[in-house]
């Protein structure tokens, strides 16, 4: 068991009780980027997964040892973000497989964004798992990706052996919508669109179709126990203005797995892409790989 207490360097530090020592040791080591930046110079090239009657998905794949790692991006984010690239460099350095991809309608993938939905992006994740990934996988989901990784673990329990959520936005857009005054909800329904303010979009807001919100409601998970039994690690910034950090506590409470850690960063925001945030993410992945490899052997 591990408890988390305030620490000047990290915002939170781990105090270990018993067997759970891997992450504690990782945090005490020198920062991972000091060695993985000089690792293998292997380049991943852009490829496309062709799917009958569905948009082709753009992806980059690094072949290597299992468990492999799959990065699932956030809402309207592409595969080239700082976290995805950092994980790829780390996987190169240790020889493990890695996949990053774009949702349909986003980035280099085919598809019409206006027709996209949580359900369709869920299918995208499963397509990557079924048709590209080989062997057991650790899923790393950022924001919306943290919601979709839970769905993937439920649908493919034999292949998904661990989850890492970064500012997991489970049920996010639906919860936000229903927190609005009833009059505003009706106005959005009549208008057919919700202009959601966001400092992370150059326009200053996201235009979310009402149909997207309505469809997303069919994929909510927090209303009942979540049948995920693998190890789960949930990282969240306490300065997150988009998805409150309490959401990760809700997810931790709802998943049935007994092996769940919630790790809070006191001064981190929703994106969690500062140097110390990336360090924590890489150490968490490293710890899970070590834990799962020990169990396997």
Curated annotation (Swiss-Prot):
Residues 1-43 form a transit peptide. Inhibited by palmostatin-B. GO terms for molecular function: hydrolase activity, hydrolyzing O-glycosyl compounds; mycophenolic acid acyl-glucuronide esterase activity; palmitoyl-(protein) hydrolase activity. It is found in: Mitochondrion. One of its GO terms (cellular component) is cytosol. It catalyses: S-hexadecanoyl-L-cysteinyl-[protein] + H2O = L-cysteinyl-[protein] + hexadecanoate + H(+); mycophenolic acid O-acyl-beta-D-glucuronide + H2O = mycophenolate + D-glucuronate + H(+). One of its GO terms (biological process) is protein depalmitoylation. It is an enzyme of class 3 (hydrolase). Residues 69-181 form the AB hydrolase-1 domain. Keywords: Hydrolase, Mitochondrion, Transit peptide. It comes from the Eukaryota. PANTHER family: MYCOPHENOLIC ACID ACYL-GLUCURONIDE ESTERASE, MITOCHONDRIAL (PTHR16138), PALMITOYL-PROTEIN THIOESTERASE ABHD10, MITOCHONDRIAL (PTHR16138:SF7). Belongs to the AB hydrolase superfamily. This is Palmitoyl-protein thioesterase ABHD10, mitochondrial. It comes from Rattus norvegicus.
């Amino acid at each position: 068991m591990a408890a988390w207490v305030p620490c000047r360097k990290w915002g939170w530090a781990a105090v270990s009780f018993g067997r759970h020592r891997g992450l504690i040791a990782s945090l005490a080591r020198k920062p991972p980027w000091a060695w993985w930046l000089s690792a293998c110079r292997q380049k991943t090239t852009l490829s496309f997964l062709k799917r009958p009657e569905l948009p082709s998905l753009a992806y980059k794949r690094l072949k290597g040892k299992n468990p492999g790692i799959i990065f699932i991006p956030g809402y309207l984010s592409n595969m080239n973000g700082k976290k995805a690239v950092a994980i790829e460099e780390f996987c190169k350095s240790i020889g493990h497989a890695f996949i990053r991809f774009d949702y349909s309608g986003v980035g280099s993938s085919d598809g019409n964004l206006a027709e996209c939905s949580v359900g369709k992006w869920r299918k995208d994740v499963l397509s990557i798992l079924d048709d590209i990934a080989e062997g057991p996988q650790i899923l790393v989901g950022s924001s919306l990706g943290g919601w979709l990784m839970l769905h993937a673990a439920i649908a493919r329990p034999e292949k998904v052996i661990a989850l890492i959520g970064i500012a997991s936005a489970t049920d996010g857009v639906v919860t936000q919508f229903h927190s609005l005054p009833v009059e505003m909800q009706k106005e959005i329904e009549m208008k057919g669109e919700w202009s959601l303010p966001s400092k992370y979009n150059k326009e200053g807001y996201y235009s979310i179709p009402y149909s997207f919100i309505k469809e997303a409601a069919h994929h909510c998970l927090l209303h009942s126990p979540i049948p995920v039994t693998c190890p789960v690690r949930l990282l969240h910034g306490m300065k997150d203005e988009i998805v409150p950090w309490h959401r990760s506590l809700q997810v931790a409470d709802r998943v049935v797995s007994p092996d769940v850690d919630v790790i809070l960063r006191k001064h981190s925001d929703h994106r969690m892409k500062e140097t110390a945030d990336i360090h924590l993410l890489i150490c968490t992945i490293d710890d899970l790989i070590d834990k799962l490899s020990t169990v396997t052997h």
